[in-house]
Amino acid sequence: MLFHVEMTVNLPSDMDAERAARLKSDEKAMSQKLQQEGVWRHLWRIAGRYANISVFDVESPAHLHDVLSQLPLFPYMDVEVRALCRHASSIHDDDR
């Protein structure tokens, strides 16, 4: 199942700089691992915001929740999820 996920990160302004840097580093490593596994199919920065738009390829809504809730920055995110389905006019064979 494909899901469009918009994630906005809101780190507390008083968060220790070292903790913030560690969280960001851990998040980057985890996101790259999920991309290599094909779970996190697309990742796009939203210009001018600490936010992204992503496409996840997971088994179920519960699987998506498990993936998102394990992200190091998840406690500091506002997340919007939309289920996707293949468009009849798409020319891409890998749209599922």
Swiss-Prot record:
Per UniProt, which keywords does this protein have? Aromatic hydrocarbons catabolism, Isomerase
Q: Does the keyword Isomerase apply?
A: yes
Q: So, what pathway does this thing act in?
A: Aromatic compound metabolism; beta-ketoadipate pathway; 5-oxo-4,5-dihydro-2-furylacetate from catechol: step 3/3
> Which example biological process does GO assign this protein?
beta-ketoadipate pathway
Q: Name the InterPro entries for this protein.
A: Dimeric_a/b-barrel, MLI_dom, Muconolactone_d_Isoase
Q: What is its EC number?
A: 5.3.3.4
**One function term, GO molecular function aspect:** muconolactone delta-isomerase activity
According to UniProt, the reaction catalysed is:
(S)-muconolactone = (4,5-dihydro-5-oxofuran-2-yl)-acetate
At the top level of its lineage, which domain of life is listed? Bacteria
**Which family does this protein fall into?**
Belongs to the muconolactone Delta-isomerase family.
- What quaternary structure, including any partners, is listed in this protein's UniProt entry? Homodecamer.
- In its UniProt entry, what is this protein called? Muconolactone Delta-isomerase 2
Q: Which species does the entry assign this protein to?
A: Acinetobacter lwoffii
Q: What is the lineage of its organism?
A: Bacteria, Pseudomonadati, Pseudomonadota, Gammaproteobacteria, Moraxellales
